[in-house]
Amino acid sequence: MATCIWLRSCGARRLGSTFPGCRLRPRAGGLVPASGPAPGPAQLRCYAGGLAGLSAALLRTDSFVGGRWLPAAATFPVQDPASGAALGMVADCGVREARAAVRAAYEAFCRWREVSAKERSSLLRKWYNLMIQNKDDLARIITAESGKPLKEAHGEILYSAFFLEWFSEEARRVYGDIIYTPAKDRRALVLKQPIGVAAVITPWNFPSAMITRKVGAALAAGCTVVVKPAEDTPFSALALAELASQAGIPSGVYNVIPCSRKNAKEVGEAICTDPLVSKISFTGSTTTGKILLHHAANSVKRVSMELGGLAPFIVFDSANVDQAVAGAMASKFRNTGQTCVCSNQFLVQRGIHDAFVKAFAEAMKKNLRVGNGFEEGTTQGPLINEKAVEKVEKQVNDAVSKGATVVTGGKRHQLGKNFFEPTLLCNVTQDMLCTHEETFGPLAPVIKFDTEEEAIAIANAADVGLAGYFYSQDPAQIWRVAEQLEVGMVGVNEGLISSVECPFGGVKQSGLGREGSKYGIDEYLELKYVCYGGL
């Protein structure tokens, strides 16, 4: 049986033994063989080789501040959402550690801003290369801590690395302007300068990509960062810190302060209100985003917010049913429905409704397989925790009580408390929770509509507007709907729209600013106007 050689050699005594493939458990004074099988359903107890052989250097449990690995006064557990088993104990940073990280980032900023764009570009490229070299290990870390199917985790690592590659190139494309003024003896210059220390707060659903999308832009611009990763998935952020160090990113430029859910509020407030922080970048819920905006307002900090969504997926009568179903599958069930751009409500025109629902249900039954993310063939892993399952369950029960029909799924999965069956509902009406509350799970509610105007009205009724999708073969309709949807991103006959080259962000209460693309670096730059006279 495979054993955890990486755990035996890494010296990280706080690591738990229940990573898939692991047969050792830590105790005071050393590591001893496991006394028995890990708890949970038999199918989830152990996946030999899941993390066995993982690079020891990548599995870190301390905070990373000023180029050093530092413990905290306390630790908190990180669990495998598939089995509920403890993966390890991680440094539980508090306000003191947060302030120390900000100070380290500020001191580093005074030096990093003077590094040439070419050198910053080179270092980011080295970081990218190391991610590619370690992509298999990084993917396994994601699957272990988030439950995401391994195939999707590999996809995230590539997506994550590509942000470093992209911004390594954008670092050398930060241009200013020369403006000719009415006065003959003057010239006006516009300089773009790094804004300063950025506080970066990231979610659990994309624990690697949401970091590099922000940090790549910040470092390319000449800023330094303090990253507070989600408490459910800190290992990915810490692995990135190790690779950043190996790439030669200077001490203090990239700092990571993991913390428990108990400390998250005060740590978030500490880094967002610190006078040495000039920029806040957050991906998460709209509710938390509003709290951070309040913190930022007191000192008028620059903010980027990528918040909640309620993405509509509209299928018009002219749509190709097979294409629409393929798009619906991709949009809804990636990461088990736990993405901010997942379709949240399906609006299907009356003439195509029955054919779409039938084909959608058949595709779900044929192509979706619930299981542990390390198991080959799994397409739907666990939800991140039982609270997430309870939310999906509540929405399903609410809809059914108000007249919705369960086409397929509809209940918890037998694999364990964090699993829920991929669910399709029809006869859904707008008074149901699932139509105005972001689900973040494998639930697809279908609303029947009659006219284009009706569909647009339903889609735009939300107070958020991140992404929207629609399928149509009518060119005139395509232009009308694309322009009328009140969202930041539109997929036309396409269910997957994210790309490093394209601007990511929303309107209304879905956020502020854009990430990725040529516009992403601007979020970390200040414009300075210089008037040069006496010429």
UniProtKB/Swiss-Prot annotation:
Protein name in the entry: Succinate-semialdehyde dehydrogenase, mitochondrial
Site residues, Transition state stabilizer: N205
Compartment list: Mitochondrion
Organism superkingdom: Eukaryota
Presequence range in chain numbering: 1-47
Cystines in this chain: C340-C342
Gene3D superfamilies for this protein: Aldehyde Dehydrogenase, Chain A, domain 1, Aldehyde Dehydrogenase, Chain A, domain 2
CDD domains: ALDH_F5_SSADH_GabD (cd07103)
Family listed: Belongs to the aldehyde dehydrogenase family.
Alphabetized NCBIfam families for the sequence: SSADH (TIGR01780)
Active site: E306, C340
Regulation affecting activity: Redox-regulated. Inhibited under oxydizing conditions.
Residues annotated with Phosphoserine modification: S499
Enzyme class label: oxidoreductase
Binding residues for substrate: R213, R334, S498
Upper lineage: Eukaryota, Metazoa, Chordata, Craniata, Vertebrata
